[in-house]
Curated annotation (Swiss-Prot):
It is an enzyme of class 2 (transferase). It comes from Arabidopsis thaliana. Coiled coil: none annotated. Disulfide bonds: none annotated. This is NF-X1-type zinc finger protein NFXL1. Residues 894-963 form the R3H domain. PROSITE patterns: ZF_PHD_1, ZF_PHD_2, ZF_RING_2. Its EC number is 2.3.2.-.
Length: 1188
């Protein structure tokens, strides 16, 4: 929406030059504004070239017209191309219909009949391009004064009838008052223009200029350095090459950076820096960078909301011909005009002015073109007719640029010696200009043969132009003998036919070798060859020989070549030179003759090009092969053929990427879930229910195309022996590999037999023997025997069984019984001789004196009712000093010692919590040295890693689990010193024992490229950094706030989880175990948020397995130990009575009993999940959990 600044006009003509209404474009999305600007003097020079230079680059302005009888209309006016304000006669009236006025390109004073009236009908006035006098217009009045003038582009003084007098009262005319009263406010106009979505663009402006102006108005341009938006009021710098816009502070920092310097330009031109956008070299220093408008005329331009941001509003004035024009361009070829647009970003438009008339290349016609087209080929289309270089014929081509072609006219010409006549091309002859009949024009390459001036001899030169010259044997030219050492007297020779006398001296002429002289007597003719013996080297310089000198210098002489091969690598770097006596053996390229280079590999490359179809046809070379130059002239389609690229295409062009679904139907019948592709279709990914290969469980959400699904359960199928179950994890059938000849036979499975022995409670240790009874051998299972009081113990073989085959009392022993008896700590108690042999495992040891003393002490304790402290549990090693330190502190502070022992127990036996790292660590609070030593001793019993950190008095101890960590033989404070299998009670945080978890930040499983130097630099004096190993570290702070800050700011930091649980307000201690998991809770409760991590059926396990046992279990330590021993040593069965598996009825019934028990127990744990009816499989949702 535009608003008008109206004022009264004075009758005085000089007053009209003080102010004038000019148009200033705001942006592409808003309307124009009429403001007052001072006018140029009347004599301002405006030439026609400047006028036309900006005619094609005018912005189009939109003005809203208000009519009383209808909605507002729009009126498009074109901007004047004059530089500066227009003359006073170029005032415009508003409320004119569309396309009413067209521009006039007449140059000169305006004609009287060229006044334009407003409120005229559409297309009334058209642009006049006539060179003669203009035709009179038909004036139409529409409630307008008689002397209302239209805009004219004529240059010159205004006519006198173009004056407007002000009203006497100083007010506007009635019609103008009505227009002004109907003018809308600015904000309302903007809102209406926005609602109507009016887009104002000028096709004559470069697209980059329009885009930059629009982005600057919307503040959507990003600085390439800081990636921040460039605002209207920000100081900027614009590159003159790529027109990128940067913040002034950002570009100054870039210019000061060492990486922005162009090293080549720095050597030649001094200080410089490169533009971040186009890398063009800027030959200014960072201190000289300043904020200027786009045309560079005004420094620190003010922010005007009606102008393009960062524009000064003045004419651009940049030369339309860049100073980096081609080198061959002369000053006359450069454009003399400047840009007349308002100060703008981006490139200036091409010049639209007319250049001075120029002649065509042939010079017959003068051509007038635009200034921007002055370097184009200006041909007139007529025949050239220029004289060719031969000087005899004219050019017959059409008017052309550049030199004329050589003359191709055929002429009959004779040679210089007049022996031969040929038809030659005129342009190939050396003789230029007119030809005379007696002159030859070319050489026939034969001897001339013309008689010389003496008349006695003939010319021996090759056919040549001009006279032949004088005879060389004339007395006037021969002054000496043949060798030149003796001068001849004039009276000796009278004519050229007289012989030349020779002297008696040695010739001494320099031979062709240029090293020796002729030793013959003065003679006629050429000197004989040089016979001096010289040393000649071969081409490679490794061998030499003695030969006559003329052999080394004669052009036809034999080349001396040795037999030594070169062996150096050729230019390809792959093959070696096999040339014998190679001149490049010693790296001397000067010895090469002609273009021959023996180290240029002549083997074809023949490598496969990147296209994969063609081979490299170049010679063997180093580096990458050039791209394939073959072309494809057929459509390049995808696999389904629905997406293609039309030819021509370069060989090796990848197939188009097709986003359509694959048309091949899935064999399973599900819908396609993958895109177009080459080759076989991927497996179907639709989730379905599937059984594992062993038939143990039904897995849900399994991809349909996934094959060979295995769970983690034991196979349990009966093997071919009929006695044992397969102990492998879930696998496809069969469990045993066998030959066809063994079909139907019971074959050993190579497992231990496991049948109960008849002589003892142990099982048969022999390999499976389905077709034979168990061998009657002595039992070799290790058992423990004791004395009567139980103090002395020893481990011996069971020794039961082992009768001979004939039933006699002769036993077969598989070991040396005497050596076992010698190692016993005490002798065996005697037995009665009843004739039956008592196995060694069923006998007892004899008590000694120490046993008697302990028995007496026990009797006294029972008599006096004395209960001594359980210090026996501390005697767990041979280190008496360590035992005394712990025992002493245990007597003084048993609660503290038990607390430390409990935390070590949780580190070794508990499960990690709160982190994906397998490392378990605990930090004790700062304490005195004697307690730190006790912590170290207790941790060493559990084989834990121990380290101390910090300074006194805040030095603390850190313990963590290692690969060697394991429970000790006895635990301090436990009854009998045994380790319970049940889950331990989680200890709670104690400020007298444990470090506050809020002060610790963990850095666990650090990647190799991780760098925590930021922690050292920022929090170096506020924390202690403790390295547990090369990938795990802890940071212990002194303040909670700084620890929380480090947790937020530092990478790879995580929450510290020790061996204690911080008790929250009102929460029962039994809700969490030591690692933060509910005892007895299933994976369904923990991972109920993720449907892929659910398991319907859970199996209880001890603390060493996948699940924690309930705290406070009723099973004793002995029962738990026996249970763990049974899990590791007992054979796997498939029925309740494994010895009756061969009976069909019993086997089928008993086999389903354990599975039924599993289903019954699982039904009480699941949340509404029911097993599949009529099958013995378990149904689970988490197939990943099962396959782990």
């Amino acid at each position: 929406m535009s608003f008008q600044v109206r004022r009264d006009r004075s009758d005085d003509r000089s007053h009209r030059f003080n102010h004038q209404q000019t148009w200033i474009p705001r942006n592409s999305s808003t309307s124009s504004v009429v403001v007052n600007e001072p006018l140029l003097p009347p004599n301002t020079d405006r030439n026609s070239e400047t006028l036309d230079a900006g005619s094609a680059s005018r912005p189009v302005y939109l003005q809203r017209q208000h009519n009383a009888s209808g909605p507002p209309s729009y009126n498009h006016h074109q901007r004047s191309s004059n530089i500066g304000p227009p003359p006073p006669n170029q005032h415009r009236r508003y409320n004119a219909p569309d396309n009413q006025h067209q521009r006039s390109d007449n140059i000169g004073p305006p004609q009287p009949n060229q006044h334009r009236r407003y409120n005229a009908p559409d297309n009334q006035h058209q642009r006049s391009d006539n060179s003669g006098p203009p035709q009179p217009y038909r004036h139409r009045r529409n409630n307008a004064p008689e002397n209302q003038h239209q805009r004219s582009d004529n240059i010159g003084p205004p006519p006198p009838n173009r004056q407007r007098r002000n009203n006497a009262s100083g007010t506007l005319p009635d019609n103008r008052q009505r227009v002004a009263s109907r003018t809308r406010p600015v904000n309302q106009g903007k809102r209406v223009a926005k609602e109507e979505n009016v887009v104002l663009t000028d096709p004559n402006l470069p697209q980059l200029v329009q885009e930059l102006q629009e982005k600057l108005v919307k503040s959507s341009i990003e600085c390439m350095i800081c990636y921040d938006k460039v605002g209207r009021s920000a100081n900027i710098w614009s590159c003159s090459s790529c027109y990128s816009i940067f913040h002034i502070n950002c570009i100054k920092r870039w210019a000061r950076a060492p990486t922005s310097v162009d090293l080549l330009a720095e050597k030649n031109q001094g200080d410089n820096w490169r533009c971040p956008g186009c890398q063009s070299v800027q030959l200014t220093s960072s201190k000289e960078i300043s904020y200027r408008c786009f045309c560079g005329k005004r420094r620190d331009p003010p922010s005007d909301p009606y102008l393009t941001p960062h524009s000064c509003g003045e004419p651009c004035g940049k030369p339309l011909e860049k100073e980096f024009a081609p080198a061959e361009t002369t000053e006359e070829d450069l454009c003399p005009h400047v840009c007349v647009l308002q100060c703008h970003p981006g490139p200036c438009p091409p010049c639209k002015a007319f250049a001075p008339p120029r002649s065509c290349p042939c010079g017959k016609k003068m051509v007038t073109t635009r200034c921007s087209e002055r370097r184009s080929d200006l041909v007139c289309g007529q025949r050239c007719d220029k004289l060719l270089s031969c000087g005899r014929h004219q050019c017959e081509r059409t008017c052309h640029v550049g030199p004329c072609d050589p003359c191709q006219v055929l002429v009959n010409a004779t040679c210089f010696c007049k022996k031969k006549v040929e038809t030659v091309i005129c342009g190939d002859m050396n003789v230029k200009g007119e030809l005379k009949a007696e002159d030859g024009v070319y050489s026939c390459s034969f001897n001339c043969g013309k008689p010389l001036g003496c008349g006695n001899h003939f010319c021996s030169e090759v056919c040549h132009p001009g006279p032949c010259g004088d005879c060389d044997l004339l007395p006037s030219r021969v002054k000496t003998c043949y060798c030149g050492n003796t001068r001849l007297e004039e009276q000796i020779r009278q004519s050229c036919l007289d012989p030349i006398p020779s002297c008696s001296n040695v010739c001494r002429k320099l031979l062709p070798c240029r090293l020796h002289t002729c030793n013959e007597m003065c003679h006629a003719g050429d000197c004989p060859p040089c016979l001096v013996q010289v040393n000649q080297k071969c081409r490679c310089g490794s061998t030499s020989r003695a030969v006559e000198c003329y052999i080394t210098t004669s052009s036809e002489a034999e080349k001396f070549v040795c037999a030594k091969p070169c062996g150096r690598k050729k230019n390809c770097g792959r093959h070696r030179c096999s040339e014998r006596c190679c001149p490049l053996l010693n790296g001397k390229k000067n010895d090469l003759s002609g273009d021959w280079d023996p180290h240029v590999c002549q083997i074809p490359c023949q490598k496969k090009l990147r296209c994969g179809q063609h081979s490299c046809e170049s010679l063997c070379h180093s580096g990458h092969c050039p791209p394939c130059l073959e072309m494809i002239f057929t459509d390049l389609t995808c696999a389904c053929g629905r997406t293609s690229i039309p030819p021509p295409l370069s060989c090796g062009t990848p197939v188009p990427s097709c986003q359509l679904p694959c048309p091949i139907p899935q064999p399973c019948g599900h819908s396609d879930t993958h895109g177009c592709h080459f080759g076989d279709c991927p497996p179907c990914s639709t989730p379905v229910e599937k059984k594992c290969v062993g038939g143990h469980v039904v897995l849900r959400n399994i991809p349909c195309g996934l094959k060979d699904i295995r769970c983690t359960k034991i196979c349990g199928k009966t093997r071919r022996c009929g006695m044992h179950a397969c102990a492998r994890t879930c696998h496809p059938e069969p469990c045993d590999s066998f030959n066809e000849s063994e079909a139907g036979m019971r074959v050993t499975c190579r497992q231990k037999c496991g049948a109960p022995r008849t002589d003892c409670r142990h099982t048969c240790a022999a390999l499976c023997h389905p077709s034979a009874p168990c061998p009657d051998l002595r039992c070799e299972f290790s058992v423990t025997i004791t004395c009567s009081c139980g103090r002395i113990t020893a481990t011996v073989p069971c020794d039961a069984g082992g009768r001979s085959a004939n039933g006699s009392n002769v036993y077969c022993a598989a070991y040396d019984e005497a050596s076992v008896l010698q190692k016993l700590p005490a002798p065996l108690q005697p037995v009665e001789s009843s004739g039956n042999r008592i196995p060694l495992g069923q006998r007892k040891l004899s008590c000694d004196d120490e046993c008697a003393k302990l028995e007496r002490k026990r009797v006294l304790q029972d008599a006096f009712d004395i209960t001594p402290p359980n210090l026996e549990a501390l005697h767990f090693s041979e280190n008496s000093a360590m035992t005394e330190i712990i025992s002493d502190l245990y007597r003084r502070d048993p609660k503290w010692v038990l607390a430390v022992e409990e935390r070590c127990k949780f580190l070794v036996l508990g499960k990690a919590r709160g982190s994906t790292s397998a490392l378990k660590v605990h930090i004790f609070c700062p304490m005195q040295k004697d307690k730190r030593d006790t912590v170290r001793l207790i941790a060493e019993r559990w084989k834990l890693g121990v380290s101390n950190a910090g300074w006194e008095p805040k030095r603390f101890t850190v313990v963590h689990v290692t690969a060697k960590s394991k429970p000790p033989t006895r635990i301090i404070g436990a009854r009998g010193g045994a380790i319970s299998i049940g889950g331990p009670h989680p200890p709670f945080y104690d400020s007298l024992v444990d470090m506050d978890p809020g002060l610790v930040v963990s850095f666990l499983d650090l990647p190799r490229e991780a760098n925590i130097s930021a922690l050292v630099l920022r929090f170096g004096g506020e924390c202690e950094l403790v390295w547990l190993n090369d990938k795990n570290a802890l940071a212990v702070f002194h303040d909670h706030a700084r620890a929380a800050t480090a947790m937020r700011r530092l990478e790879h930091g995580s929450v510290y989880h020790g061996a204690v649980v911080v008790q929250s307000g009102g929460q029962s201690p039994s809700l969490n175990n030591v690692w933060g998991k509910l005892p007895g809770s299933s994976a369904w409760d923990v991972d109920k948020g993720n449907p892929w991590r659910r398991a319907v059926i859970q199996e209880s396990d001890d603390s060493w397995g996948a699940e924690d046992s309930p705290i406070g279990g009723s099973s004793t330590d002995a029962q738990a130990s026996a249970l763990r021993s049974a899990k590791s040593n007992s054979p796997i069965v498939t029925s309740v009575n494994r010895w009756s598996v061969l009976e069909p009825k019993k086997a089928s019934t008993s086999t389903l009993e354990p599975i039924a028990q599993i289903e019954e127990s699982s039904s009480s744990k699941t949340t509404g999940k029911q097993p599949v009816e009529g099958s013995g499989e378990e149904v689970v949702d988490d197939w990943e959990k099962v396959c782990e």
